[in-house]
Amino acid sequence: MKKILIIGLGLIGSSIALGIKRAHPDFEILGSDRENIQEIAQKRGIIDSKVSLVEGAQKADIIILAVPIITTLELLKKLATLNLKKGLLITDTGSTKSEIVELANQLFDEDKVRFIGGHPMAGSHKSGVMAADINLFENAYYVLTQENQELRDLLKGLHAKFIILDAKEHDRVTGQVSHFPHILASALVWQSDDFSKEHPLVKHLAAGGFRDLTRIAEADSLMWTSVLLSNPEITIDRIENFKKQLDEIALKIANKDSAAIEHFFEQGKKIRQAMEIHKGALPNFYDLFISVPDEKGVVLKVLGLLEDFSITNVKINEENREDIHGQLQISFKRAEDLKEAREIIEKATDFTVV
């Protein structure tokens, strides 16, 4: 019986365990974490056995490190001192890859212990073992730093989309589309809070657009500190690049160059619409925005048209916003469902669908 050790039984580690169990019910899942977390995981059928780090590592055929980056680095050093099975496969789930992969390559002889960096690009506003979700990674990208069929097979029950990406390129790409936006979100919150000291209405008028832009500012501060410090060069490069872009648009505004300003927004709109937005580090789905009249029963009418679809979330935006796409927001897990739902609503109603 193949033994899989998962170190870290939070949302990611526990959800991976459930996915492995779905595809490989004959595998034994060992779990290492704090005693109370292990107890919960075992009672909920997420793991089969509770083990200490040393005991589990020496028994395991595959080890998954589902812990923060700084802890992953410490654990790799600890594992390198243990008597591990020859041919052991180790992988991680960290949001950056270069520092982790470089350390693993220094510590382990590939003929004895193999290391494949991993990054499941999905998450939730919930956390901890109680939030474990067998479908968390469905249709989400799962990055591997090199091809490995054994790991693909192990994780096939996650129903994720595996892509192979060099560690350095992974950090460049995620630095732009994941790490840097978290800096922007928190910076905008800081700026607005400072501005509100002289203009207190800021906090009352900050509605839809501000809320959407700054949602990720509520992410785990310790985790994101660890992420940024693990990817400093790319992060600083993206900050400097953004400063230049802000300076350029500021100059256009100062020069009252309306054509250039309009082009700035129009081009941004086109680029955004052309992007295929998938699940990222936090929940992100395929969203349909519908402008509906403020009438009784209209939401039920729309949902009735979509009764055969798997809908992830329905949100009614109550405030009137000058920048909103539609008062009703419906989220799907699959792009195909969004496309079909759009066609159904457009045929059955005169509502504007975006």
Swiss-Prot record:
Domain Prephenate/arogenate dehydrogenase: 2-283
Cysteine-cysteine disulfides: none
Domain annotation ACT: ranges: 287-354
CDD domains in UniProt: ACT_PDH-BS
Gene3D superfamilies according to UniProt: 6-phosphogluconate dehydrogenase C-terminal like domain (1.10.3660.10), NAD(P)-binding Rossmann-like Domain (3.40.50.720)
Alphabetical list of PROSITE patterns matching this protein: ACT, PDH_ADH
The entry's keywords: Amino-acid biosynthesis, Aromatic amino acid biosynthesis, NAD, Oxidoreductase, Tyrosine biosynthesis
Domain of life: Bacteria
Signal peptide: none
Keyword Acetylation: no
SUPFAM superfamilies: 6-phosphogluconate dehydrogenase C-terminal domain-like (SSF48179), NAD(P)-binding Rossmann-fold domains (SSF51735)
GO biological process: tyrosine biosynthetic process
Recorded metabolic or biological pathway in which this protein acts: Amino-acid biosynthesis; L-tyrosine biosynthesis; (4-hydroxyphenyl)pyruvate from prephenate (NAD(+) route): step 1/1
Family: Belongs to the prephenate/arogenate dehydrogenase family.
Protein name per Swiss-Prot or TrEMBL: Prephenate dehydrogenase
Organism of this sequence: Lactococcus lactis subsp. lactis (strain IL1403) (Streptococcus lactis)
